[in-house]
Amino acid sequence: MASRLVAGLQVLALAGTATAVLTWDEAYAKANTALARITQQDKVSLVSGIGWDKGPCVGNTAPVSAINYPQLCLQDGPTGVRFGTGVTAFTPGIQAASTWDVELMRQRGQFQAEEQKGCGVHVMLTPVAGALGKIPEGGRNWEGFGVDPYLAGIAMEVTIEGQQSVGVQATAKHYLLNEQELNRNTMSSNVDDRTLHELYLWPFADAVRANVASVMCSYNKINGSWACENEHAMQKLLKDELGFKGYVMSDWNAQHTTTGSANAGMDMTMPGSDFNGGNVLWGPQLNTAVNNNQVARTRLDDMARRVLAAWYLTEQDKGYPPINIRANVQGNHKENVRAVARDGIVLLKNDAGALPFKAPRRLAIVGSASVANPRGINSCVDRGCNEGALGMGWGSGTTNYPYFSAPADAIRARAQQDGATVTLSASDSTADVANTVRDADAAIVFLTSNSGEGYLLVDGSYGDRLNLDPLHNGNQLVQAVAQANKNTIVVVHSVGPLVLESILSTPGVTAVVWAGLPGQESGNALVDVLYGSVSPSGKLPYTIARATADYGTAIVPGDDNFPEGLFVDYRHFDRANIQPRFEFGYGLSYTNFTYSNIKVASTVRSGPATGPVVSGGRADLWETVATVTATVTNSGGVAGAEVAQLYVSYPKGGSVPETPPRQLRGFNKLKLAPGASGTATFNIRRRDLSYWHVGQQNWVVPAGAFGLEVGASSRDLRLKESITVV
């Protein structure tokens, strides 16, 4: 992480917008001084939203004039400034994860924060570590960074570093175990202690390590207790075990009681009332509870101190732009959108060099998903429809498009440079599609699968996907096109995995391009890959199965007991010896890469973590205890980038409980010219070799032989080594 941090700081310094931030100790010293100058009512105002739709932002608190504390503005979110009119529509988190590029992730976070700050937003309601994505149909999986906690954790860390370097408070959400939209307001997520630590809490530890200012508690119950009044989750795990020094805010109307939430460790309520303006649980009610000794004054002080400390940590007391959600703040940020959209494209299939295009004379484009929404790119509230090309899912994590580069428009513009003709059928009907594609050198079919937040109904779905098939009869459309054109390219824009067996078994389908969720630069990014301006370098942040049942998880109608435990996605496939269609970490290139010369150095010793608790947990968990290096060579004829991946297997037998056969514990993206070689370096932290010992309530490195495998995906592992821990 140290080398990534140095490189990231260099990027931020060059941008000229990063600001120095205080340490938590310095921020707390300032907060204590301020706390001594304000009244009990002021403290209540600091931690209470003023009510839904009572201010310019989705969340607002009252100002405290005695310390020059402003009206705090809290705003979504994951793809940009929600409701903004002069903002960038960034790529969602799942697309950033598909790049496996930590510097693009960091820059994405920085650029997002620059826009939030330019609009006067103090607290940006992002990034997302939950849903982690254990259920492939889960409605909000696309907002986060994929199903692996290590990948999600690194993405959370560098994103928050980028965001808070600009002086905006980041929010890690949704804490915790909010894995589906169905019944999210009533269900209980019941999970065992080890699974909780090793999967779902893991990326939040990375967020705390990055000094995240706030954490948002979720709608669901955790082991029978509402997340926003669950003392074990908020106090014991987050604040005590992980050393979180910021504040816990509720998701919007996720609070259920006045005293229960306060005494359990929640620090701020949002938005302060229900969506009808009633049911105020803090504000005057909190003041009364404190006066009646139902909530201790020291607890109120702790809430207010945490909120103030986060404000000082990001140095928002030193002048801040006024709130103006309609400010034009786009700058050059579309460059990051295009880069993430492009480098997150995963090439799944490419028979006989169908791609990149070699100046075809006639192209055919098919599908409603190839063009912009004919009703207008922002015509659907919170992107709550599936009309036209897909750039993001739907819900509160969306933003308005300033423009949208539609795939058909971008392909047509590029084809004209070659003097080519393009025929378009912006329909999903199979009726006359053969006439459109029959004479083309290549036919490009566009498919989608969409999901989002449960307050909107889209294509029969309240958030979670109904199945893992393409929408709008996509399989039949591909079959009809490929029957008439034997060079059919399928482009998929999707929030998550699809079952592609029908498409892959269709004769005439020569290539499948997984374009994900590209934001506003959709078409431009796709053209970069289709025409070979760059070689595709994205890798899957989840598994694509041969059948939906292969995942072993599904949306549940009541409480979810998490019976799969640790074994989700590739961990489950490996344990059950199920052959996926495309494994986690998979992705083709226009060039080839070879791996060689693996080396290992280790100082690790077995036993529990013993260091003091710092931000992120015990300090020694974050120490590098082993280093693995490998040489990666571009053995092909064009430039490309390879994501070298490190997987660790734990010792078998003895006192070690059952562990997934292999787990991601490092990745390195190398950009290489033809014939060039680079060194992939993986710094393994003590944490990465530990398991959660339920009896000791601690992270423990077991004795024995750890397997180390380096390769191009979770099932394409080219190099093997081991370390023996005593």
Curated annotation (Swiss-Prot):
Signal peptide per UniProt: 1-20
Major place of residence: secreted
Subcellular location field: Secreted
Keyword hit for Hydrolase: yes
Upregulating conditions: The transcript levels are constant during infection.
Entry's EC annotation: 3.2.1.21
Residues the record marks as carrying a glycan: N223, N592
Temperature dependence as stated in the record: Optimum temperature is 50 degrees Celsius.
Pfam family, one: Glyco_hydro_3_C
Reaction(s) catalysed (UniProt annotation): Hydrolysis of terminal, non-reducing beta-D-glucosyl residues with release of beta-D-glucose
Name of the top EC class for this enzyme: hydrolase
Note: The biological conversion of cellulose to glucose generally requires three types of hydrolytic enzymes: (1) Endoglucanases which cut internal beta-1,4-glucosidic bonds; (2) Exocellobiohydrolases that cut the disaccharide cellobiose from the non-reducing end of the cellulose polymer chain; (3) Beta-1,4-glucosidases which hydrolyze the cellobiose and other short cello-oligosaccharides to glucose.
Name of the protein this chain belongs to: Beta-glucosidase cel3A
